[in-house]
Protein backbone atom coordinates (compact mmCIF):
# COMPACT_ATOMS: atom_id res chain seq x y z
CA UNK A 1 0.00 0.00 0.00
CA UNK A 2 1.07 3.59 -0.57
CA UNK A 3 2.60 5.53 2.31
CA UNK A 4 -0.01 8.17 1.48
CA UNK A 5 -2.80 5.81 2.51
CA UNK A 6 -3.61 6.26 6.20
CA UNK A 7 -4.45 2.60 6.84
CA UNK A 8 -1.52 1.26 4.88
CA UNK A 9 0.97 3.58 6.52
CA UNK A 10 -0.27 3.22 10.10
CA UNK A 11 -1.16 -0.48 10.21
CA UNK A 12 0.63 -2.22 7.33
CA UNK A 13 3.69 0.08 7.34
CA UNK A 14 5.66 -1.21 4.35
CA UNK A 15 9.41 -0.76 4.18
CA UNK A 16 10.24 2.32 2.04
CA UNK A 17 12.06 1.38 -1.19
CA UNK A 18 15.01 3.61 -0.28
CA UNK A 19 15.29 2.42 3.34
CA UNK A 20 18.82 1.73 4.60
CA UNK A 21 17.57 -0.62 7.33
CA UNK A 22 15.33 -3.70 7.58
CA UNK A 23 15.84 -4.62 3.92
CA UNK A 24 15.14 -8.29 4.66
CA UNK A 25 11.78 -7.46 6.23
CA UNK A 26 8.44 -6.70 4.59
CA UNK A 27 7.03 -4.39 7.26
CA UNK A 28 8.50 -1.64 9.42
CA UNK A 29 7.63 -0.66 13.01
CA UNK A 30 4.25 1.04 13.13
CA UNK A 31 4.36 4.82 13.76
CA UNK A 32 1.26 4.47 15.93
CA UNK A 33 0.98 3.55 19.61
CA UNK A 34 -2.35 3.09 21.38
CA UNK A 35 -2.62 2.69 25.14
CA UNK A 36 -5.82 2.49 27.17
CA UNK A 37 -6.09 3.58 30.80
CA UNK A 38 -9.08 3.35 33.08
CA UNK A 39 -11.73 3.10 34.08
CA UNK A 40 -11.53 6.56 35.62
CA UNK A 41 -14.27 7.81 37.94
CA UNK A 42 -15.17 11.22 39.29
CA UNK A 43 -18.05 13.68 39.81
CA UNK A 44 -18.35 14.24 36.07
CA UNK A 45 -17.74 10.58 35.23
CA UNK A 46 -19.90 8.54 37.67
CA UNK A 47 -19.91 5.43 35.49
CA UNK A 48 -16.22 5.59 34.81
CA UNK A 49 -14.50 6.02 31.50
CA UNK A 50 -11.45 5.08 29.52
CA UNK A 51 -8.57 7.30 28.52
CA UNK A 52 -6.97 6.36 25.21
CA UNK A 53 -3.42 7.58 24.65
CA UNK A 54 -2.57 7.97 20.97
CA UNK A 55 1.09 8.31 20.06
CA UNK A 56 2.01 9.22 16.49
CA UNK A 57 5.61 9.39 15.30
CA UNK A 58 7.04 11.61 12.57
CA UNK A 59 4.95 11.79 9.41
CA UNK A 60 2.13 9.87 11.10
CA UNK A 61 1.11 13.01 13.03
CA UNK A 62 -0.65 14.19 9.86
CA UNK A 63 -3.03 11.23 10.16
CA UNK A 64 -4.41 12.16 13.58
CA UNK A 65 -7.85 13.09 12.14
CA UNK A 66 -8.04 9.63 10.55
CA UNK A 67 -7.19 7.96 13.87
CA UNK A 68 -9.78 10.04 15.70
CA UNK A 69 -12.44 9.15 13.13
CA UNK A 70 -11.55 5.45 13.39
CA UNK A 71 -11.82 5.53 17.19
CA UNK A 72 -15.21 7.21 16.93
CA UNK A 73 -16.45 4.65 14.40
CA UNK A 74 -15.17 1.81 16.58
CA UNK A 75 -17.19 3.18 19.47
CA UNK A 76 -20.36 2.89 17.44
CA UNK A 77 -19.51 -0.70 16.48
CA UNK A 78 -18.75 -1.66 20.08
CA UNK A 79 -15.74 -3.34 21.63
CA UNK A 80 -15.13 -6.65 23.36
CA UNK A 81 -17.07 -9.87 22.98
CA UNK A 82 -20.23 -8.08 24.16
CA UNK A 83 -19.72 -5.29 21.58
CA UNK A 84 -20.16 -2.55 24.17
CA UNK A 85 -20.48 0.87 22.54
CA UNK A 86 -18.69 4.00 23.68
CA UNK A 87 -18.54 7.66 22.68
CA UNK A 88 -15.54 9.98 22.56
CA UNK A 89 -15.90 12.84 25.00
CA UNK A 90 -12.88 15.01 24.27
CA UNK A 91 -9.41 15.04 22.75
CA UNK A 92 -6.44 16.48 24.66
CA UNK A 93 -3.17 17.54 23.05
CA UNK A 94 -0.64 16.52 25.71
CA UNK A 95 2.04 18.83 24.26
CA UNK A 96 -0.10 21.94 24.81
CA UNK A 97 -2.78 20.81 27.26
CA UNK A 98 -5.48 22.01 24.86
CA UNK A 99 -8.71 20.05 25.24
CA UNK A 100 -11.24 19.86 22.40
CA UNK A 101 -14.75 18.67 23.32
CA UNK A 102 -16.17 15.99 21.02
CA UNK A 103 -19.64 14.75 20.25
CA UNK A 104 -21.92 16.73 18.00
CA UNK A 105 -21.74 17.92 14.45
CA UNK A 106 -20.05 21.21 15.35
CA UNK A 107 -17.12 19.60 17.18
CA UNK A 108 -13.80 20.86 15.85
CA UNK A 109 -10.47 19.32 16.83
CA UNK A 110 -7.30 21.24 16.16
CA UNK A 111 -4.44 19.18 14.74
CA UNK A 112 -1.95 18.24 17.49
CA UNK A 113 1.36 20.02 17.76
CA UNK A 114 4.33 18.02 16.49
CA UNK A 115 7.10 18.08 19.10
CA UNK A 116 10.66 17.18 18.13
CA UNK A 117 12.40 15.36 20.98
CA UNK A 118 16.18 14.93 20.60
CA UNK A 119 17.58 11.48 21.26
CA UNK A 120 20.28 12.33 23.78
CA UNK A 121 22.30 11.03 26.69
CA UNK A 122 22.11 12.38 30.21
CA UNK A 123 24.75 13.48 32.68
CA UNK A 124 26.77 10.72 34.38
CA UNK A 125 25.75 10.20 37.99
CA UNK A 126 25.48 7.81 40.89
CA UNK A 127 21.73 8.21 41.27
CA UNK A 128 19.85 4.88 41.23
CA UNK A 129 17.33 4.61 38.44
CA UNK A 130 14.01 2.85 38.88
CA UNK A 131 12.02 1.68 35.86
CA UNK A 132 8.34 0.82 36.13
CA UNK A 133 6.95 -1.48 33.43
CA UNK A 134 3.34 -0.35 33.18
CA UNK A 135 2.20 -2.62 30.36
CA UNK A 136 3.68 -6.02 29.46
CA UNK A 137 7.18 -5.68 27.99
CA UNK A 138 7.86 -8.60 25.65
CA UNK A 139 11.49 -8.67 24.52
CA UNK A 140 13.35 -11.35 22.60
CA UNK A 141 17.12 -11.85 22.87
CA UNK A 142 19.05 -14.60 21.11
CA UNK A 143 15.77 -16.15 20.02
CA UNK A 144 14.43 -16.45 23.57
CA UNK A 145 11.93 -14.42 25.58
CA UNK A 146 13.52 -12.10 28.14
CA UNK A 147 12.09 -12.99 31.55
CA UNK A 148 14.75 -11.22 33.63
CA UNK A 149 15.46 -7.65 32.61
CA UNK A 150 18.89 -6.07 32.95
CA UNK A 151 19.90 -2.59 31.83
CA UNK A 152 21.81 -3.79 28.76
CA UNK A 153 18.74 -5.48 27.30
CA UNK A 154 16.54 -2.52 28.16
CA UNK A 155 18.96 -0.04 26.56
CA UNK A 156 19.45 -2.27 23.52
CA UNK A 157 15.71 -2.56 22.89
CA UNK A 158 15.23 1.17 23.47
CA UNK A 159 17.98 2.25 21.08
CA UNK A 160 16.84 -0.15 18.37
CA UNK A 161 13.25 1.06 18.67
CA UNK A 162 14.25 4.73 18.53
CA UNK A 163 16.68 4.26 15.64
CA UNK A 164 14.18 2.35 13.48
CA UNK A 165 11.42 4.89 14.13
CA UNK A 166 13.82 7.72 13.31
CA UNK A 167 15.13 6.13 10.12
CA UNK A 168 11.75 4.96 8.80
CA UNK A 169 9.39 7.73 9.92
CA UNK A 170 11.61 10.73 10.67
CA UNK A 171 12.23 13.79 8.53
CA UNK A 172 16.00 13.99 9.12
CA UNK A 173 17.08 11.59 6.41
CA UNK A 174 20.10 13.76 5.64
CA UNK A 175 21.48 13.19 9.15
CA UNK A 176 23.12 9.97 10.21
CA UNK A 177 22.37 8.13 13.45
CA UNK A 178 24.97 9.60 15.80
CA UNK A 179 24.76 7.23 18.75
CA UNK A 180 27.12 4.26 19.06
CA UNK A 181 24.51 1.73 20.12
CA UNK A 182 26.97 -1.14 20.58
CA UNK A 183 29.20 0.92 22.87
CA UNK A 184 26.23 2.15 24.90
CA UNK A 185 24.89 -1.38 25.37
CA UNK A 186 28.35 -2.49 26.52
CA UNK A 187 28.37 0.39 29.00
CA UNK A 188 24.91 -0.56 30.26
CA UNK A 189 26.10 -4.13 30.73
CA UNK A 190 28.40 -2.87 33.52
CA UNK A 191 25.47 -1.53 35.58
CA UNK A 192 24.13 -3.72 38.38
CA UNK A 193 20.49 -4.59 39.02
CA UNK A 194 19.76 -3.43 42.58
CA UNK A 195 16.21 -4.68 42.96
CA UNK A 196 14.06 -6.73 40.61
CA UNK A 197 10.35 -6.77 41.34
CA UNK A 198 9.16 -7.68 37.88
CA UNK A 199 6.92 -10.62 37.09
CA UNK A 200 5.74 -12.31 33.94
CA UNK A 201 2.06 -12.03 33.07
CA UNK A 202 0.41 -14.18 30.44
CA UNK A 203 -2.12 -12.83 27.97
CA UNK A 204 -3.39 -13.77 24.53
CA UNK A 205 -5.03 -11.97 21.65
CA UNK A 206 -7.42 -13.66 19.25
CA UNK A 207 -7.06 -12.56 15.65
CA UNK A 208 -10.33 -12.86 13.75
CA UNK A 209 -8.49 -12.25 10.50
CA UNK A 210 -6.08 -15.14 11.07
CA UNK A 211 -8.48 -17.24 13.12
CA UNK A 212 -5.96 -17.99 15.88
CA UNK A 213 -4.64 -16.76 19.20
CA UNK A 214 -1.33 -14.95 19.60
CA UNK A 215 0.65 -14.96 22.88
CA UNK A 216 1.19 -11.46 24.25
CA UNK A 217 2.67 -12.12 27.69
CA UNK A 218 5.41 -9.90 29.06
CA UNK A 219 7.12 -8.42 32.09
CA UNK A 220 5.43 -5.90 34.40
CA UNK A 221 6.54 -4.41 37.70
CA UNK A 222 9.62 -2.46 38.77
CA UNK A 223 13.37 -2.90 38.47
CA UNK A 224 16.09 -0.65 39.90
CA UNK A 225 19.56 -0.09 38.46
CA UNK A 226 22.67 1.15 40.26
CA UNK A 227 25.55 3.53 39.62
CA UNK A 228 26.07 4.37 35.97
CA UNK A 229 22.45 4.09 34.88
CA UNK A 230 21.70 7.81 35.10
CA UNK A 231 23.32 8.61 31.75
CA UNK A 232 20.61 6.56 30.00
CA UNK A 233 17.64 8.36 31.58
CA UNK A 234 16.74 10.60 28.58
CA UNK A 235 16.97 7.69 26.13
CA UNK A 236 14.85 5.44 28.35
CA UNK A 237 12.24 8.12 28.99
CA UNK A 238 11.81 8.72 25.28
CA UNK A 239 11.70 4.99 24.52
CA UNK A 240 9.06 4.54 27.20
CA UNK A 241 6.85 7.05 25.42
CA UNK A 242 6.99 5.17 22.12
CA UNK A 243 7.02 1.71 23.82
CA UNK A 244 9.46 -1.12 23.17
CA UNK A 245 9.34 -4.81 22.33
CA UNK A 246 6.48 -6.74 20.79
CA UNK A 247 2.88 -5.58 20.32
CA UNK A 248 3.55 -1.86 20.84
CA UNK A 249 0.59 -0.94 18.63
CA UNK A 250 -1.62 -2.70 21.20
CA UNK A 251 -0.23 -0.66 24.08
CA UNK A 252 2.38 -3.15 25.28
CA UNK A 253 5.93 -2.12 26.09
CA UNK A 254 5.08 1.09 27.95
CA UNK A 255 7.38 1.99 30.84
CA UNK A 256 8.33 5.05 32.86
CA UNK A 257 11.62 6.04 34.46
CA UNK A 258 11.81 7.24 38.05
CA UNK A 259 14.95 8.83 39.52
CA UNK A 260 15.58 10.52 42.84
CA UNK A 261 16.48 13.74 41.05
CA UNK A 262 16.00 15.10 37.55
CA UNK A 263 18.90 14.50 35.24
CA UNK A 264 20.11 17.26 32.96
CA UNK A 265 19.92 16.14 29.33
CA UNK A 266 22.98 16.80 27.18
CA UNK A 267 23.42 16.15 23.46
CA UNK A 268 24.94 12.85 22.46
CA UNK A 269 27.25 14.72 20.09
CA UNK A 270 29.18 17.97 20.30
CA UNK A 271 26.38 19.93 18.67
CA UNK A 272 22.72 19.49 19.53
CA UNK A 273 21.82 20.16 15.91
CA UNK A 274 23.55 16.89 15.02
CA UNK A 275 21.55 14.79 17.47
CA UNK A 276 18.87 12.57 15.99
CA UNK A 277 15.36 13.23 17.17
CA UNK A 278 11.90 11.74 17.09
CA UNK A 279 8.89 13.84 16.17
CA UNK A 280 5.63 12.93 17.86
Kindly label every feature range from the protein language model.
Residues 1-280:
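RNA-interacting cores
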